A protein has these predicted regions:
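ABC ATP-binding cassette signature C-motif
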Residues: 1-228
Length: 228
């Protein structure tokens, strides 16, 4: 609960291997809280969470990894190693960074000289080196340029593990998830098969927007559509 408002209430579900789930709803309704509960970073006030065996989790949150400013792109990603292991195969770091749109001559550039979009690509390159079968991403599309957004989308489409994704980007959600957890702002979560467009067509987003109004907030004359 937060300020006497329950963010996740009486939610029971089963996540299967390979599920691709998008968490949608207005800001502050408990999406990040639920992710932290599932990851064991927070403890529930009631109920329990059971996890499967042999879970390997990679977590990308809104704060992002802190990059070492004076180190190069390559050294930030590999801790100074020349080779990385990707899907069981050894690759040279220069070739791997090419997958993230860094030309060879750019790989030795200090992070402090990078643009915001390049920094995001460095963090994604670090993330996808982690062996995982559960990928948890909290607002990964924030501050991404178009090239990096397309790169991330391709990576997630190719990912064959379980995905839990929080994002306000409707098209991105439609392209990478197969089911939704929709937060209504009162602690209740609805489960729906399909992406954001499927849910919106079936239920009408304006209804969810009304439910998601913050406690104590007065209704506006005209209700906006819900934002994921």
């Amino acid at each position: 609960a937060w300020k006497d408002v329950s963010q996740v209430n009486d939610f029971s579900t089963l996540v299967m291997r390979g599920d691709r789930i998008g968490l949608v709803g207005p800001n502050g309704v408990g999406k990040s809280t639920l992710l932290k509960l599932l990851l064991g970073k927070l403890q529930p006030q009631s109920g329990n969470i059971r996890t499967g065996t042999k879970l390997e989790v990679a977590y990308f949150d809104q704060s992002r990894d802190v990059l070492e400013e004076d180190k190069s792109i390559a050294d930030n990603v590999t801790d100074g190693k020349d080779h990385v292991v990707v899907n069981g195969q050894s690759r040279h770091v220069i070739g791997y960074l090419g997958d993230f749109l860094f030309p060879p001559e750019r790989a030795r550039t200090p992070v402090k000289a990078l643009s915001g979009g390049e920094r995001n690509r460095v963090m994604l390159a670090k993330l996808f080196l982690k062996p995982c079968n559960l990928l948890v991403m909290d607002e990964p599309t924030n501050d991404l340029d178009i090239e990096t957004l397309e790169l991330l989308e391709e990576r997630l489409i190719d990912f064959d593990g379980t995905l839990l994704l929080v994002s306000h980007d409707r098209a991105f959600i439609d392209n990478v998830v197969t089911q939704l957890w929709v937060f209504d702002g009162s602690g209740h979560i609805d489960e729906h098969v399909g992406g954001y467009s499927d849910w919106h067509e079936r239920t009408g987003g304006h209804k969810k927007a009304q439910k998601a109004e913050a406690p104590g907030q007065k209704s506006a004359d005209k209700k906006p559509e819900a934002q994921p």
